[in-house]
């Protein structure tokens, strides 16, 4: 307690005034209605207190009014119902309102006039005056020894260990230190005081005394420093020492007396100053007892005792929060009487009044006591009774502290009359009484002040306890929070563990399901693999089975192919055997023919030799005869007058033909037939007849015999002996052509004739002469009636106007000196010796014959029909054994019926026959498409030169295409340029060419990638039949397939044929090679295709005069590229 007591200091006046001012600002008068009854008043009072406390809590943010906060919160107002009477006083003080020392919950007692509107005017004035005095004293009143306690601003040091004893702390812990009522607080204060030790109590008293002395010194510091004032201060201090010593003695005595009773039971009497603990702040003492005025050291009674009595009665009724009823359960009536017996006097009120105005009244009272003591001492010394007043009045210094007094102080003493009244009353009292009254007043004052000190110490202890409790509660709350957080953490951990366990269980379940699913999938996969393996095995077995079947089919197919190849090979062998036999047969036939030819040649040579000898003999005879005639003529010239006897001359050479009376058309005899009788068995007897020509066939050129000069021995013999046939190769110029020398240069040696200058026909043999001789026109078309006499062409035209196939006689231009010398037309002759190009026995062109003696005139040919009929067998045999033996091995000999059909001029009507296998050298409108000219350099055919009897070149025909002196003959062929007849082609070659062309046309017309170039043999056969000439015999399928098996070469078109068996039958495909690509379109029959000849003509290939070209012939006039002989 010793460490605690020095901290309690008295506040400075400025601090006290500031606290009081702030507390006044928070306090407000509280009007109350007049209660109807005691119980209702108490109820209303409690309700009002609770309502005000709630409002203050809401406005200031403090704890409720019934609690005492350590940091300045409100505490419940302590109310002590004191009701004591003084015999001399005449009024009762029934209640006193004590407020909280902190000043937050300050509550003023309303003036009695507020509850009594029916009071008199004098009472109202007194109340107003008392209210003014109270308000004036509030401004500067501060209790001297009560310090301001604010735990929030200045922390208190802890109390001693005695304060925290086990019994006290245990008792306080059992009770609520936060919510304490007034009765509980009183009990706690009393317990606190009794628990204090002697030293602690003495220390509290000493602290209070020092605070009072300090306050008095502060109040007197502005006073003068004279001896009187010094003595006064010394007297005051001595008086205080005596008073506090006496007060402490009384406290010790009370404490010692009550200590035993406190320990024994609840009947405890309070100390003299503890009858009513003033729970109010130092600045709030003026709020309670402001209506009492100081008595200047004397106790006086107010003028109107009844008013005061009524005022206190009203105060008891209005401000009675703690009535006797509230303590009936706590204390007995005797204990309450002893407890409240200390303050049942008017002096308590006066002592409370002395505490007003910051202890100023108390200081004044102490000064008065000191002055009286000094006056008493002076009176004792000088014996002057009234020294005190004179001494006091003679002191002229100013007031002790003018600054501390307010203007309202004058209002506390309204008139001079009241002051005179108080002085008179004090003078009436004895000095002893005044001293006793002063001491008593000091004791009461000291008790009041000490109560405040004890209350302050108690509150400090309570504050520390509450602070400790708060700390404990905070710690406990913190512990609770920690425990709660730990519990939450544990719960969270439990939840996490639970979740983790659940998750683990879920994962295990998931893993189990996955494992089960994987096992199922593995089983399903194994089952699927097993099924796949079974399927693979099945497929493998099926594949092996199919492979075996395929192999079997391939073996069967290979066997069939082998059989087919074997059959084809056997068939080919048979065919080869047949061909070999045929070839052997042909060879044998050829040998026979050669033997026959050899025999014929020998016979012919023999005949020729005989004929030559005969001709030579005749020539010699003729020469000798002519020599004789010449000699005779010369002799006659030398002797003109002499008439020589000349021999008999032969008949004239220009014989006139004898026309029979009934001329009948007779078939012209072929030149080859005229000389072939000698080769027959009966040719010896008919040799003379063979040289004779019928009168109809006598040429006009015989008239040239009369132009032989009678003189001209120097001229060369132009004609050989008639008996010797002239060979075409031994002539000086080609037969039928004039000598190559120009006119007038006959003596020059002519150049040898070129191969292409050998014409076939005489240049001047006209169509009508040929008809007279029984030969058809060289072009194969007889001249129509009325056309045998033709007019000559004008000299300006260089070519004859002859339509194709209808030759007109064209007079050559230059018919003057450049005309060829006429020569005799040859008669029938014997066969010429064979050379490199033998003429076919079927050739219709007339052969040149040597000029012979004119034969005698005979009968017309119609008279010799029987003779010719009897010789037909000889002609047939001659055709078979003669020129037929010279045919190629592959050529098929034609019969006499075919020959008769193909020979032009054999029919009476002018028929235009189609081409046949054996084409003649005579010109035809429709040459054989399969033929090829063998004699490219020899104009065998009359169509080489264009017009048959065009103008002959005087100096020999130039090379083809070169300019000559003669005019260019017109082209008589249907398609322009002269087309050579091709050599005779065998049937297999022709069929193979047709098959090649058919395959190419089918590939062009219907190309198909899927077929691979293969075509159905039936379609190929149909195409071949379309391409086959109409006069050719039909081709069978077997013949075509057999020919397709032959190998290709340059003659049959080349390439190879592939034959395979398909679903629809056999298929054929042509595969060309280098030979087939170079030969080109050998068998092309369509003009305009690649390889076909370019049509050219000097005149339109239309019909001539009244004759057109047959439409079908246009597709037949072509030729393929030649392949040589």
Swiss-Prot record:
Residues 415-636 form a coiled coil. It comes from Emericella nidulans (strain FGSC A4 / ATCC 38163 / CBS 112.46 / NRRL 194 / M139) (Aspergillus nidulans). InterPro entries: Fungal_stress_NST1 (IPR051195), NST1 (IPR025279). Residues 302-332, 401-430 have a biased composition (Acidic residues). GO terms for cellular component: cytoplasm. The lineage of its organism: Eukaryota, Fungi, Dikarya, Ascomycota, Pezizomycotina. Residues 39-48, 123-134 have a biased composition (Basic residues). Residues 1-185, 259-333, 378-435, 474-773, 792-916 are annotated as: Disordered. It is found in: Cytoplasm. This is Stress response protein nst1. Residues 484-494, 504-637 have a biased composition (Basic and acidic residues). Residues 671-695 have a biased composition (Low complexity). Keywords: Coiled coil, Cytoplasm, Stress response. Pfam families: NST1 (PF13945). It comes from the Eukaryota. Residues 11-20, 68-78, 138-153, 831-847 have a biased composition (Polar residues). Belongs to the NST1 family. May act as a negative regulator of salt tolerance. Its main location: cytoplasm.
């Amino acid at each position: 307690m010793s460490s605690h007591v020095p901290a309690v200091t008295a506040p400075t006046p400025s601090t006290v005034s500031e606290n009081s001012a702030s507390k006044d600002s928070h306090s407000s008068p509280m009007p109350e209605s007049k209660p109807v009854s005691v119980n209702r008043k108490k109820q209303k009072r409690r309700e009002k207190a609770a309502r005000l406390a709630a409002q203050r809590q809401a406005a200031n943010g403090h704890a409720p009014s019934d609690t005492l906060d350590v940091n300045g919160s409100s505490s419940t107002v302590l109310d002590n119902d004191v009701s004591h009477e003084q015999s001399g006083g005449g009024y009762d003080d029934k209640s006193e309102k004590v407020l909280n020392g902190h000043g937050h919950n300050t509550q003023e007692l309303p003036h009695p006039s507020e509850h009594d509107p029916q009071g008199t005017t004098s009472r109202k004035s007194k109340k107003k005056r008392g209210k003014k005095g109270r308000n004036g004293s509030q401004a500067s009143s501060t209790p001297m020894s009560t310090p301001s306690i604010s735990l929030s601003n200045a922390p208190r040091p802890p109390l001693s260990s005695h304060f925290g004893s086990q019994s006290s702390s245990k008792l306080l812990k059992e009770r609520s230190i936060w919510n304490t009522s007034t009765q509980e607080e009183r009990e706690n204060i009393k317990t606190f005081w009794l628990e204090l030790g002697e030293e602690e109590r003495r220390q509290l008293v000493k602290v209070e005394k020092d605070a009072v002395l300090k306050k008095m010194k502060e109040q007197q510091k502005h006073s003068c420093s004279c001896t009187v004032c010094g003595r006064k201060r010394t007297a005051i201090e001595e008086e205080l020492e005596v008073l506090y010593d006496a007060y402490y003695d009384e406290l010790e005595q009370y404490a010692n007396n009550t200590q035993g009773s406190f320990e024994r039971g609840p009947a405890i009497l309070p100390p003299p100053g503890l009858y009513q603990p003033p729970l109010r702040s130092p600045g709030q003492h003026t709020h309670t007892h402001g209506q009492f005025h100081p008595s200047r050291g004397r106790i006086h009674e107010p003028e109107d005792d009844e008013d005061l009595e009524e005022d206190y009665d009203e105060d008891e009724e209005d401000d009675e929060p703690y009535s006797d009823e509230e303590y009936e359960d706590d204390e007995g009536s005797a204990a309450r009487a002893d407890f409240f017996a200390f303050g049942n006097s008017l002096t308590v009120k006066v002592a409370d009044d002395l505490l007003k105005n910051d202890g100023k009244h108390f200081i004044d009272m102490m000064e008065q006591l000191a002055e009286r003591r000094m006056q008493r001492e002076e009176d004792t010394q000088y014996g002057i009774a009234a020294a005190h007043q004179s001494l006091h009045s003679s002191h002229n210094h100013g007031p002790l502290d003018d600054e501390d007094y307010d203007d309202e102080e004058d209002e506390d003493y309204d008139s001079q009359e009241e002051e005179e009244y108080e002085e008179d009353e004090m003078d009436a009292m004895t000095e002893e009484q005044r001293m006793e009254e002063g001491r008593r007043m000091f004791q009461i004052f000291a008790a009041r002040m000490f109560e405040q000190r004890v209350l302050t110490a108690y509150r400090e202890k309570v504050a520390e306890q509450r602070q400790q409790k708060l700390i404990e509660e905070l710690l406990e709350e913190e512990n609770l929070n920690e425990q709660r957080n730990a519990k939450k953490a544990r719960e969270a951990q439990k939840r996490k563990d639970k979740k983790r366990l659940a998750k683990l269980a879920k994962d295990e379940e998931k893993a189990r399901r996955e494992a089960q699913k994987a096992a199922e999938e593995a089983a399903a996969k194994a089952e699927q693999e097993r099924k796949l393996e079974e399927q693979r095995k099945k497929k493998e077995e099926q594949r092996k089975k199919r492979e075996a079947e395929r192999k079997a089919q391939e073996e069967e197919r290979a066997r069939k192919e082998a059989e087919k190849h074997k059959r084809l090979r056997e068939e080919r062998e048979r065919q080869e055997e047949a061909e070999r036999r045929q070839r052997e047969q042909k060879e044998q036939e050829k040998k026979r023919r050669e033997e026959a030819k050899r025999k014929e040649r020998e016979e012919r040579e023999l005949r020729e030799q005989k004929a030559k000898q005969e001709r030579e003999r005749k020539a010699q005879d003729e020469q000798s005869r002519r020599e004789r005639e010449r000699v005779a003529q010369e002799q006659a010239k030398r002797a003109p007058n002499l008439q020589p006897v000349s021999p008999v001359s032969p008949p004239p050479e220009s014989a006139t033909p004898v026309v029979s009376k009934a001329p009948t058309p007779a078939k012209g005899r072929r030149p080859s037939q005229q000389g072939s009788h000698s080769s027959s068995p009966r040719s010896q007897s008919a040799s003379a007849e063979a040289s004779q020509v019928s009168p109809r066939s006598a040429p006009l050129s015989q008239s040239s015999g009369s132009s032989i000069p009678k003189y001209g021995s120097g001229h060369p013999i132009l004609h050989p002996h008639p008996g010797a046939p002239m060979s075409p190769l031994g002539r000086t110029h080609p037969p039928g052509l004039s000598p190559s020398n120009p006119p007038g240069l006959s003596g020059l040696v002519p150049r040898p004739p070129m191969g292409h200058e050998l014409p076939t026909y005489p240049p001047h043999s006209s169509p009508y002469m040929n008809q007279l001789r029984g030969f058809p026109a060289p072009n194969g078309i007889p001249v129509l009636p009325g056309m045998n006499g033709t007019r000559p062409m004008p000299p300006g035209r260089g070519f004859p106007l002859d339509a194709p196939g209808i030759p007109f006689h064209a007079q050559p231009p230059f018919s003057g000196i450049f005309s060829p010398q006429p020569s005799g037309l040859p008669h029938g002759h014997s066969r010429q010796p064979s050379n490199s190009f033998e003429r076919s026995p079927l050739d219709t062109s007339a052969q040149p014959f040597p000029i012979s003696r004119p034969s005698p005139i005979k009968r017309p040919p119609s008279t010799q029909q029987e003779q010719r009929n009897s010789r037909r067998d000889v002609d047939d045999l001659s055709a078979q054994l003669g020129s037929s033996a010279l045919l190629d091995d592959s050529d098929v000999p034609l019969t006499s019926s075919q020959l008769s059909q193909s020979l032009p001029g054999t029919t009476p009507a002018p028929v235009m026959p189609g081409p046949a296998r054996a084409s003649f050298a005579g010109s035809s409108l429709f040459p054989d498409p399969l033929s090829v000219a063998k004699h490219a350099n020899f104009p065998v055919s009359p169509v080489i030169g264009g017009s048959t009897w065009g103008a002959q070149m005087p100096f020999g025909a130039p090379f083809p295409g070169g300019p000559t002196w003669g005019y260019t003959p017109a082209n008589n062929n249907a398609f322009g340029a002269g087309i050579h007849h091709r050599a005779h082609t065998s049937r297999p070659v022709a069929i193979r060419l047709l098959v090649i062309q058919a395959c190419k046309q089918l590939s062009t017309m219907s190309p198909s990638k899927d077929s691979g170039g293969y075509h159905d043999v039936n379609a190929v056969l149909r195409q071949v039949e379309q391409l086959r000439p109409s006069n050719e015999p039909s081709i069978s399928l077997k013949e075509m397939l057999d020919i397709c098996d032959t190998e290709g070469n340059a003659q049959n078109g080349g390439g190879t044929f592939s034959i395979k068996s398909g679903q629809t039958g056999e298929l054929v495909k042509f595969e060309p090679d280098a030979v087939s690509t170079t030969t080109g379109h050998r068998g092309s029959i369509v003009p305009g295709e690649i390889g076909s000849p370019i049509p050219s003509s000097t005149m339109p290939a239309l019909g001539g005069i009244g004759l057109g070209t047959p439409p079908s012939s246009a597709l037949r006039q072509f030729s393929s590229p030649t392949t040589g002989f």
